[in-house]
């Protein structure tokens, strides 16, 4: 679960159209949210308030080993009007989970329409007690596509009483670059991330789009980072590949990543798929080419809908549903299929509660694929009888597939969830993590446990156990 200050920072990025998914450090963010999620330790309560649209404060108190806490302040040069308190915020925005990667064409349009991003800034500071530890962060937008990020930590237990990290970031639709400097070990780093291909470059004029492609909105990102510690003369290098796509027949997204560290010989691959609106599955395989050590990690998250009298799923109750024009033309030529078509549509709408985009008032385009559970099942009414496909048919089928993709994403965003259950395990480490996060009255609650197997007695033991309450106005 995000802290309130982290939530405000993400709202600041959304207000200024800064794409976090286009940063190299977030290339494996989806798998980390499902496998490496933190477990609360002890008791913690967080009370926050946004006094104005430009400023907010937060107070945290916990009893881990001893009574301690912190006091934080945040200021934004632009109004953060897209924020909500813990009573009204959706769990999709308050909890780290599956992240849908958008094609570069969508990112380009967002950045092009950006008006408020230039010269915007965000200031954040936190003071811990007891003790004299301080942390601060400054975000300064230099241009529409570049910003300066500074993070500072002041702690008497650190060398020279603290450290500072400076990020100079350039983020465009096609690529992102970062130049990083840290006072710790005089560390210098360079990160790059490139998005291959373009959503507008696909050409299927000679192929029926009802047959292929079965996946669209695909994004292939490749990146690398190079580090050099000037004091110890130690290098660092890693590379990563991310492939994200969404099925055109079901709209379900999936993400695959491959990360390599050639210096230590570590290879890591992940596969994450959103199996339904309320569930996600993730797997991760680690391998070392030098020691031949390997590890398999599995995890999933399962959302629960809020208890309501009506069905939590959006429905077609107030929408006029119609098929695509190409399908109607085919049915007129083959009347024997009309009865089967009508019967199937009735069963289809009762079984799959997916709300699509609206067109011309209350008209709604439905999915032309007959069986949403089978991504390889093609509706024959969409296939041309003579094997040729016109430009109009191409556009209609493309728009329909985009509608199905957008419908699934809208259904995820608009669903009213009350809680989420997360589970992850590692076969080699023999560790099990269980986390429950949800809404209790006007509070957001996070509680979980981390279990491991004692190598001597072979009995389970608790590594972490705690509960956290968060309240924000």
Curated annotation (Swiss-Prot):
Biological process according to GO: establishment of mitochondrion localization; mitochondrial genome maintenance; mitochondrial outer membrane translocase complex assembly; mitochondrion-endoplasmic reticulum membrane tethering; phospholipid transport; protein insertion into mitochondrial outer membrane
Entry GO terms, CC: ERMES complex; SAM complex
Entry's localization field: Mitochondrion outer membrane
This protein's record includes keyword Transmembrane: yes
Keyword Acyltransferase carried by entry: no
Keywords per UniProt: Membrane, Mitochondrion, Mitochondrion outer membrane, Transmembrane, Transmembrane beta strand
Membrane topology: Multi-pass membrane protein
Coiled coil regions in record: none
Quaternary context: Component of the ER-mitochondria encounter structure (ERMES) or MDM complex, composed of MMM1, MDM10, MDM12 and MDM34. Associates with the mitochondrial outer membrane sorting assembly machinery SAM(core) complex.
Entry text on domains: Lacks alpha-helical transmembrane segments, suggesting that it resides in the membrane via beta-sheet conformations similar to those predicted for other outer membrane proteins and porin.
PANTHER family per UniProt: MITOCHONDRIAL DISTRIBUTION AND MORPHOLOGY PROTEIN 10
Function of the protein: Component of the ERMES/MDM complex, which serves as a molecular tether to connect the endoplasmic reticulum and mitochondria. Components of this complex are involved in the control of mitochondrial shape and protein biogenesis and may function in phospholipid exchange. MDM10 is involved in the late assembly steps of the general translocase of the mitochondrial outer membrane (TOM complex). Functions in the TOM40-specific route of the assembly of outer membrane beta-barrel proteins, including the association of TOM40 with the receptor TOM22 and small TOM proteins.
Homology family: Belongs to the MDM10 family.
Protein name per UniProt: Mitochondrial distribution and morphology protein 10
Gene: MDM10
């Amino acid at each position: 679960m995000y802290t309130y200050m982290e939530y405000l920072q993400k709202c600041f990025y959304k207000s200024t159209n800064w794409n976090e998914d286009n940063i190299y450090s977030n290339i494996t963010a989806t798998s980390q949210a499902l496998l490496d999620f933190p477990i609360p330790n002890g008791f913690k309560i967080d009370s926050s308030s946004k006094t104005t649209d430009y400023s907010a404060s937060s107070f945290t108190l916990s009893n881990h080993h001893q009574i301690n806490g912190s006091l934080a302040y945040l200021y934004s040069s632009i109004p953060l009007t897209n924020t909500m308190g813990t009573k009204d915020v959706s769990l999709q925005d308050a909890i780290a989970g599956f992240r849908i990667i958008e094609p570069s064409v969508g990112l380009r349009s967002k950045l092009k329409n950006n008006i408020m991003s230039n010269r915007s800034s965000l200031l954040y500071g936190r003071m811990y007690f007891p003790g004299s530890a301080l942390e601060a962060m400054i975000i300064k937008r230099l241009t529409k596509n570049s910003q300066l990020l500074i993070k500072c930590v002041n702690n008497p237990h650190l060398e020279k009483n603290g450290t500072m990290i400076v990020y100079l970031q350039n983020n465009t639709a096609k690529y992102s670059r970062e130049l990083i400097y840290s006072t710790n070990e005089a560390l210098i780093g360079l990160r790059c991330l490139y998005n291959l291909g373009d959503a507008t470059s696909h050409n299927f004029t000679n192929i029926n789009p009802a047959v292929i492609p079965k996946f669209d909105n695909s994004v292939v990102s490749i990146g690398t980072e190079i580090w050099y510690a000037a004091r110890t003369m130690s290098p660092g290098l890693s590379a990563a590949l991310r492939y994200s796509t969404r099925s055109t027949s079901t709209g379900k997204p999936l993400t695959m990543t491959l990360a390599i560290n050639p210096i230590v010989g570590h290879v890591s691959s992940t596969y994450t798929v959103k199996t339904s609106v309320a569930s996600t599955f993730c797997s991760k395989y680690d391998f070392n080419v030098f020691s031949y050590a390997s590890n398999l990690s599995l995890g999933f998250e399962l959302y629960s809908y809020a208890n309501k009298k009506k069905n939590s799923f959006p429905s077609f109750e107030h929408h006029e549903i119609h098929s695509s024009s190409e399908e109607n033309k085919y049915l007129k030529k083959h009347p024997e299929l009309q009865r089967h078509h009508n019967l199937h549509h009735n069963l289809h709408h009762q079984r799959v509660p997916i709300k699509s985009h609206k067109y011309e008032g209350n008209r709604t385009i439905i999915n032309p694929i007959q069986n949403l559970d089978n991504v390889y099942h093609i509706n024959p009414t969409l296939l041309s009888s003579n094997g040729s496909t016109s430009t109009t048919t191409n556009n209609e089928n493309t728009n329909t597939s985009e509608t199905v993709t957008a419908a699934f994403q809208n259904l995820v965003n608009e669903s009213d969830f009350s809680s989420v259950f997360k589970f992850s395990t590692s076969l080699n480490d023999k560790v099990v993590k269980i986390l429950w996060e949800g809404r209790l009255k006007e509070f957001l609650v996070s509680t979980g446990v981390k279990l491991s197997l004692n190598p001597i007695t072979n009995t389970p033991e608790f590594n972490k156990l705690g509960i956290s309450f968060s309240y924000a106005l």
